[in-house]
């Protein structure tokens, strides 16, 4: 058996003794969660694009699920928003109706997070009581739930950065919030696809035991992992671009600021701040990472089909 196959068997969440109907139920459940996470990310993106993220100035994990229901409640929420820099420096004079539009975007984003938590927790308890969850899968699911809870707290930590001295949120916290969302999504898919229907014996039978196969498999695994890491870094770089509105000032392609490698990439001091706070450098890095991902993916595909 190849090393790759042995590793796959070691890390798989599949238990060959699990009935097929248990596997199907767990896969459906995790698939629904993955779909909702994508919806959550899309709504979060819309919340960012509409500058709605600071419209709710407090974090109430339980009672916050209920939106303002009366005129007095709406007025109280609006008055709280009027105290933060985004209103006093950018949106002064905004009407209550315009504020409601911002509020609903942010409320929908937070509500989706709560809803995903319930979609995870309630079926999880039902599956656990019914004996559907294999022993090796249990700590992974619990870890995923904890990560989701931490993501909610991180979201508030991000929003909090824009309530006192800034008119927007910290790009560092925005990138961290988005990065954790991607980790949760990726972990959910990993658990879902780990619940395969083949047995260990079938997997062993399909694996060729040769030195050449082991070497090729190891190289393929490392290359795929490197590409996955590059994609993750590219997503984080995109979040940094969004966090400092870097796309607005440099919106031409393939040139940026009139050149493929523009001047001004080292304008900030100390030098490392350019990677995170210089809009030109942040967008340049984002583009270069994109090119790198494309080239690496094509090279990997060609190597797999032996061209």
Regions found by a protein language model. Name each.
Residues 305-307:
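Conserved small/polar residues in nucleotide/adenosyl-binding loops
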Residues 80-118, 273-293:
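Individual transmembrane alpha-helix segments
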Residues 116-121, 179-196, 292-299:
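Hydrophobic cores of alpha-helical transmembrane segments in multi-pass inner/ER membrane proteins
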Residues 2-21, 197-220:
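Membrane-interfacial, low-structure loops and terminal tails that flank and connect transmembrane helices
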Residues 25-36, 136-145, 213-236:
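Interfacial segments of alpha-helical transmembrane regions
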């Amino acid at each position: 058996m190849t090393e790759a196959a042995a590793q796959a068997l070691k890390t798989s969440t599949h238990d060959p003794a699990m009935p097929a109907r248990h596997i199907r139920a767990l896969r459906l459940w995790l698939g629904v969660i993955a779909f909702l996470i994508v919806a959550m990310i899309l709504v979060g993106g819309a919340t960012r694009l509409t500058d709605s993220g600071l419209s709710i100035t407090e974090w109430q994990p339980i009672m916050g699920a209920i939106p303002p229901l009366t005129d007095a409640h709406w007025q109280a929420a609006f008055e709280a928003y009027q105290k933060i820099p985004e209103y006093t420096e950018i949106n002064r004079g905004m009407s209550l109706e315009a504020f409601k539009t911002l509020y609903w975007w942010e409320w929908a984003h937070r509500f989706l997070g709560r809803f995903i938590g319930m979609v995870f927790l309630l079926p999880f308890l039902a599956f656990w009581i019914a004996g559907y969850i294999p022993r090796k899968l249990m700590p992974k699911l619990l870890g995923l739930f904890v990560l989701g809870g931490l993501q909610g707290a991180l979201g508030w930590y991000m929003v909090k950065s824009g309530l006192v001295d800034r008119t927007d949120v910290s790009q560092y916290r925005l990138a961290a919030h988005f990065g954790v969302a991607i980790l949760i999504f990726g972990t959910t898919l990993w658990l879902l696809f780990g619940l395969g229907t083949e047995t260990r014996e079938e997997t062993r039978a399909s694996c060729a035991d040769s030195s050449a196969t082991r070497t090729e498999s190891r190289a393929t695994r490392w290359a795929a992992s490197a590409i996955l890491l590059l994609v993750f870094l590219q997503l984080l770089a995109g979040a940094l671009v969004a966090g400092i509105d870097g796309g607005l000032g440099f919106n031409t392609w393939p040139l940026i600021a009139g050149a493929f490698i523009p001047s001004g990439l080292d304008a900030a001091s100390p030098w490392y701040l350019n990677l995170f706070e210089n809009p030109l450098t942040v967008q340049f890095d984002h583009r270069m990472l994109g090119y790198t991902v494309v080239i690496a993916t094509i090279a990997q595909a060609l190597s797999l089909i032996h061209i």
